């Protein structure tokens, strides 16, 4: 996590708590010449356009007051969608028995990406049940080898 995203989380988290929203993810990226601050939010039952607009207004005010980003940027506040990121411990716990996509820093069993059902989570590893040629297999993945994890839509 970058210093900017850490600072933004500190600013945004109290706003989300006041609105009874969950701060799902903060991402600060440069695309071409433009910078984007993308904030994903959620709440019980999901967020709608009005929720995103309200959160965007509150976040914009707080960001202007605290000014943690020196360059001009576009603020994008949205729902995390069906393929929401899995980052926090509670995210992993909530994803047990659900489809996940895991991208790794280094290959495990020759693969850097795994799609399957999250079976187990502990402090050191996760276990994802994957299908390989019509057979299911449990893949144990050390958590420190996970580059990104997200919910997945399996068809």
UniProtKB/Swiss-Prot annotation:
**Keywords linked to the UniProt accession:** Cytoplasm, Ribosome biogenesis
Check the record and name the SUPFAM superfamilies matching this protein. YhbC-like, C-terminal domain (SSF74942), YhbC-like, N-terminal domain (SSF75420)
Mind listing the GO biological process terms from this record?
ribosomal small subunit assembly; translation
* Record's subcellular location: Cytoplasm
Annotated coiled-coil segments of the chain: none
Cellular component per GO?
A: cytosol
Question: Which Gene3D superfamilies would you find in this protein's record?
Answer: Ribosome maturation factor RimP, C-terminal domain, RimP-like superfamily, N-terminal
Top-level taxonomic group: Bacteria
Pfam families according to UniProt? DUF150_C, RimP_N
Cysteine-cysteine disulfides: none
- Sorted alphabetically, which InterPro entries does this protein's record hold? Ribosome_maturation_RimP, RimP_C, RimP_C_sf, RimP_N, RimP_N_sf
Functional note: Required for maturation of 30S ribosomal subunits.
Q: What family does the database annotate?
A: Belongs to the RimP family.
Provide the protein name: Ribosome maturation factor RimP
Gene name, Swiss-Prot/TrEMBL: rimP
